[in-house]
Amino acid sequence: SGPLPTGGHIEQSDGTSWMAMYCLNMLAMALELASEDSAYEDVASKFWEHFTQIAYAMNNRGDDGVSLWNEEDGFFYDVLHVPNQGEIPMKTRSMVGLIPLYAVDTLEPELLKRLPNFKRRLDWFIANRPGYTRNQACMFTPGMGERRLMSIVDGDKLRRMLRYMLDENEFLSPF
């Protein structure tokens, strides 16, 4: 791809979500390796932090005041940054806005018990960087079976996105 003819750049909901999913996939591998070699707990912590920071960036208005999540519509959109014109959300409901649903995984309680250094860093990050875990799935409230959910979207966002995804006038085919 080349530069935009008018300059500027696009913040991509789908591309950013794929990177969040990549971090979760790498986290899963690092946790598996850490079960055999505790040195990988540091690597796992780094991938978890990267995932959390990506999720934060997608859900919150940064220094430039831009968020990929549109609170009014209840959907993720790409955002076009145009010189001298500011930021323009590209309000087209497409698969681009559903890809954030792909970046999801769980942490099992048994795993956290086996990897105390990872759990300590996870708990420290949640306690000392609370803004980063805001507006994504709740990491500090254990769910069914004491699992912890890692997801870009929290329950409210999930329900709002599913309204579009399961609507025959939007995404769901009648066939």
Language-model-detected regions and their locations in the chain:
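Acidic, mature catalytic/reactive cores of soluble proteins
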Residues: S1-F175
